[in-house]
From Swiss-Prot:
This is Hexitol phosphatase B. It catalyses: sugar phosphate + H2O = sugar + phosphate; 2-deoxy-D-glucose 6-phosphate + H2O = 2-deoxy-D-glucose + phosphate; D-mannitol 1-phosphate + H2O = D-mannitol + phosphate; D-sorbitol 6-phosphate + H2O = D-sorbitol + phosphate. GO terms for molecular function: 2-deoxyglucose-6-phosphatase activity; glucose-6-phosphatase activity; magnesium ion binding; mannitol-1-phosphatase activity; metal ion binding; sorbitol-6-phosphatase activity; sugar-phosphatase activity. NCBIfam families: HAD-SF-IA-v3 (TIGR01509), PRK10826.1 (NF008087). It comes from Escherichia coli O157:H7.
Amino acid sequence: MSTPRQILAAIFDMDGLLIDSEPLWDRAELDVMASLGVDISRRNELPDTLGLRIDMVVDLWYARQPWNGPSRQEVVERVIARAISLVEETRPLLPGVREAVALCKEQGLLVGLASASPLHMLEKVLTMFDLRDSFDALASAEKLPYSKPHPQVYLDCAAKLGVDPLTCVALEDSVNGMIASKAARMRSIVVPAPEAQNDPRFVLANVKLSSLTELTAKDLLG
């Protein structure tokens, strides 16, 4: 019989979990692609990009519809700048975020953020919502060889928190993020978007919620 693991830290994803930014990333991506003359009506030809780093998404577009002019890195920077601008305009904090972070603190957990988005965006978003002081460590996959579903960003966040990945619970909204956290051997809580709630792949998670407002101490600690 296995011994229940002791949970010492909670690590949150950002896009789609803390802020409703996935539609904003999509809008930023399509705005920039359209400006390059790319046929954005072919968006459905791309594989599932939810939770992927934006440079990986840009590479997928380029492989199907190469453009002339700006480099892929320049295009990535344009999409990021546009996404940040849209977040600042709309301030899309999702329900239950403050309460979820507070619950983690009440349970004595360290709190981290592990995201595919750039580090300066993580800082900006947390500061925007007065949450920066609640997070003990931030980890971004922007400069890593591989982003989610690779586990490295979760392993990096655990290292920054000074804890073993086995003592972490990860909170995610995407399949790619869930796979990353499970590959890091963490307890997994998923809060899928309504349209993804019935995705059978989420059976891999330890807990599935429809909103962070439902989060309990038992969900966190097991």
